[in-house]
Amino acid sequence: MRFSRIPPIFANVVRQTHYRNYANGVIKPREFNKVMVANRGEIAIRVFRALTELNKTSVAIYAEQDKNSMHRLKADEAYLVGKGLPPVAAYLTIDQIIETALKHNIDAIHPGYGFLSERSDFAAACQNAGIVFIGPSPDVMARMGDKVAARQAAIEAGVQVVPGTPGPITTADEAVEFAKQYGTPIILKAAYGGGGRGIRRVDKLEEVEEAFRRSYSEAQAAFGDGSLFVEKFVERPRHIEVQLLGDHHGNIVHLYERDCSVQRRHQKVVEIAPAPALPEGVREKILADALRLARHVGYQNAGTVEFLVDQKGNYYFIEVNARLQVEHTVTEEITGVDLVQAQIRIAEGKSLDDLKLSQETIQTTGSAIQCRVTTEDPAKGFQPDSGRIEVFRSGEGMGIRLDSASAFAGSVISPHYDSLMVKVIASARNHPNAAAKMIRALKKFRIRGVKTNIPFLLNVLRQPSFLDASVDTYFIDEHPELFQFKPSQNRAQKLLNYLGEVKVNGPTTPLATDLKPAVVSPPIPYIPAGAKPPTGLRDVLVQRGPTEFAKEVRSRPGCMITDTTFRDAHQSLLATRVRTYDMAAISPFVAQSFNGLFSLENWGGATFDVSMRFLHECPWERLQTLRKLIPNIPFQCLLRGANAMGYSNYPDNVIYKFCELAVKNGMDVFRVFDSLNYLPNLLVGMEAVGKAGGVVEAAIAYTGDVTDKSRDKYDLKYYLNLADQLVKAQAHILSIKDMAGVLKPEAAKLLIGALRDKFPDIPIHVHTHDTSGAGVAAMLECAKAGADVVDAAVDSMSGMTSQPSMGAIVASLQGTKHDTGLSLDDISKYSAYWESTRQLYAPFECATTMKSGNADVYKHEIPGGQYTNLQFQAFSLGLGPQFDEVKRMYREANLVLGDIIKVTPSSKIVGDLAQFMVQNNLTRETLVDRADDLSFPKSVVDFMQGNVGQPPYGFPEPLRTKVLRGKPKVDGRPGENAKPVDLDAVKVELEEKHGRTLSEEDVMSYSMFPTVFDEFETFRQQYGPVDKLPTRLFLTGLEIAEEVDVEIESGKTLAIQLLAEGKLNKRGEREVFFDLNGQMRSIFVVDKEASKEIVTRPRALPGVRGHIGAPMPGDVLELKIKEGDKVTKKQPLFVLSAMKMEMVIDSPIAGTVKAIHAPQGTKCSAGDLVVEVEP
């Protein structure tokens, strides 16, 4: 008799009669035709699959918020319930569910788990409507689904129980009285539901009342009834549960037990069947007691009896789950019994014998483990996450079963429901093998867009005590190492985010001109595969140390070359924008062909902060990368004495630590200079380098003209005296740093000749710029006068404000006693590569405004790199024709400051003052006259205070007094009395701020450039290793249909193609479509220009401790403060509710509530600003 064949007018009467007779055992029920699942998500789909296998029509219900959920689509039919109701409430509308079932001729309803699955009133409503409830009868549910009633039944059946309240309680006072009688710890549990909802352990009497309120609220929200019961807490138990099946003929069997001891907040995380290492005697008694209890109450259908087993083997009944369990899967895997099919067929009236299920035939084979993959962030206390799944790839293969619902790319994880995404079940011959399969499967998962607990699950599975099966419910609490995660790299998706950002919003690195990077592939000279670099000068340094290294340099015939192409050349010509990507590409050729170089300058100066600020790459990683590719040539960097890589003075311990780390990472030669030639600053840098084991190249910044007798400040005597002090300070190499290129050939001959005569044993190294056009001639004179090393840039990166041409110097010295030993053929190939590569940096090309050098540098003495910047600024402001005036004013500013040494940061001081004078139409005389009333640039004030150091000939007066107006002065070395930085404390603070383990190098970058580092770190976490992208794509992105291969590491290459860019949606976003490794992916990018019109909720700013945001998406359930309130640190501010979990958010600081941005009831996204506290 099928219900569907009965005319609708009589259907309800027949159904009621049928069900009553069925319940009383009078008639044998017939087969179902249509079965509804009153649930959602993966359990609904699990039941649908069973119905399909049994050739039955599956029917889904769904809430409005679940309109796009997969369970609605998987069913044969689906109907909306709870229209206009909150998301969870829709699945609790018994009347609407029954009405829908009657309307569509539903024969039976399967409740799944959660929601109404343990509500006896729902089972009764089904019965009254003539619909079969697939589960226990209403009276059994009322008794067993109610945990207190189930406890009483256990006592009646002779099963030992844990001390607890005799019935549900609804007031905190009752909980307090129980705690007083039995002592703490106690546990509060929801009386009408499970899944960890409404459960709290309480260790102190004074905490009972607040815990009761929270548990009651959670239970009310999850199950529609906040009643709780209280039990004495059993210490260190294992959580063992027994799976039961009972028919309507009085037969009952067990399907053995499961171990659910791995729990968090009383919610199961990992389940195992059968329970490993459970003593056989205990197992048999537990199974027998579970059957005894089930027979005592006349249990029907599927259910679970749960026990706590203590360390001595004593066990206590805790509850019955009168429904199917989430972890039923592991029992199915070890017994081969389809529990859901069995449920349905038992509800149809079949006996266990009909199903060929008897205790004797039910056996276990092997072991099974289930892991619940959830959208929770274990690094943040398992905060639920929600949002769009951008990427989903599962782990599969032999021994792996996946039960899921919303696990696919494009799926939106709602904040309204449970965070379970997919259940992964691994089965094998034994527990360790099952764990190995599970580890393999979880490692293959790729889920992007939402956080998951997979890293935590992997740590659990690898933990020795888990593998030894010696875990109890304290397992997670007692193993903090489970929360030590290796951050997910997520490189591919982050790079897509970057390319999408560039496509929608344009370059992330500001482009200096309208020129576009050329579409070129720079030619890389051929190198035989596996060829090892020949021996170079670095081998001497590594084997014999800095002192012997210096002797070796001095003893070698000829003049050696330092190649500045990797640093100062592009700093001068291309705004310091050359990326590691392009340096690394040519590095193997450099190692093979230029082993005769003295050094390769590739680090320091402006490159350090620019690499983070504009190129979004780590300067330390650049050093590490190049060191691996060029092991044979010494690396050279520019060290600003007490400024290190920065622009201000740092405490000494920062300088020393920086040098230590630089040497550790592969730096060899440190050109130590000071922007004022201030000896105390120089000595700090020299001592730090020497202590670290680096080569100390003490540099004297050159200015003026030693051949001009009228310029008596920086004469030959000045340089010889300073050089004498540096040599006495144990410099390994003496350097002349001509940063403006004002060292004329004749001056070079005089100065270098005098230094060589006075210091015959120390190597001399000369650096210059070719701004005047006389750089090659000057370097040739240096070589002839006794210089051991001169600086040059490869031909296509030389000239103008860069260094002189390497090819020109090498060719000019060939065949002489100063021969460099370098090959012009190799230089030609090297130059061809950089000529092509330079076109990629067209947006930063100085040649757009600068067409040649200019000998007027001998007057204004502007350093090479600064000259380029000043000229570009002038042209960009429409002052190109007045650039000569800008240069003239630079000279005036220098003179008014006392004719100082000009190199970063002192050159910036002169530049700032020059612009200030131009803007205010000042001359040298009027500046001094009006100084009392002018607001000078900060850099000028700092200089006058002595914060940069002491000029060789003192500060200009009365200008200094007028500028300072009583401000304090520093008379000695600025950093001498600076408090050491607690680098360990900084590391802890940074790791807390950025949420990952940071290196010593990261801490050092922050110590010198705190804001730049923070922004770089935030950028990299969002967009990944953009340094792996080819330069043109990094700067301007992909064109539609363009493809690119991106090697993210050796043997791992991403194939990326940009497919399309979507239209603007109502959230101000555009969807950008990519093909990644043959699979389509899409991301949503906020159109920053269009979104200016869209009102959004303010965001909590990272690093601002008074900004307290929503740590997860959810609703503001309760505000515990109001504006103007004084709050203490860790005082509760508000309660957030998400995924049926409540979280109390505390204040991280003491202060006053400045503003509440999200009133009670507000729906928040993760990171939305809720409360603002003013310290």
UniProtKB/Swiss-Prot annotation:
GO function terms (MF aspect): ATP binding; metal ion binding; pyruvate carboxylase activity
Can you tell me which residues form the catalytic site?
Answer: 323
What are the ATP-grasp domain coordinates in residue numbering?
A: 151-348
Checking Pfam families in the record gives: Biotin_carb_C (PF02785), Biotin_carb_N (PF00289), Biotin_lipoyl (PF00364), CPSase_L_D2 (PF02786), HMGL-like (PF00682), PYC_OADA (PF02436)
The entry's substrate-binding residues are: 567-571, 640, 904
The record's Gene Ontology biological-process terms are: gluconeogenesis; pyruvate metabolic process
Q: Which InterPro entries does the record associate with it?
A: Aldolase_TIM, ATP-grasp, BC-like_N, Biotin_carboxylation_dom, Biotin_COase_C, Biotin_lipoyl, Carboxylase_cons_dom, CbamoylP_synth_lsu-like_ATP-bd
Q: Which GO terms describe its cellular component?
A: mitochondrion
Name its pathway.
Carbohydrate biosynthesis; gluconeogenesis
- Reactions catalysed according to its record: hydrogencarbonate + pyruvate + ATP = oxaloacetate + ADP + phosphate + H(+)
* Residues modified to N6-biotinyllysine: 1140
Which sites bind a divalent metal cation? 568, 737, 767, 769
Any stretches that span the bilayer, and where are they?
Answer: none
Cellular location(s): Cytoplasm
Give the quaternary structure.
Interacts with sir-2.2 and sir-2.3.
| Function text | Pyruvate carboxylase catalyzes a 2-step reaction, involving the ATP-dependent carboxylation of the covalently attached biotin in the first step and the transfer of the carboxyl group to pyruvate in the second.
Question: How is this protein named in the record?
Answer: Pyruvate carboxylase 1
Instruction: Name the source organism.
Output: Caenorhabditis elegans
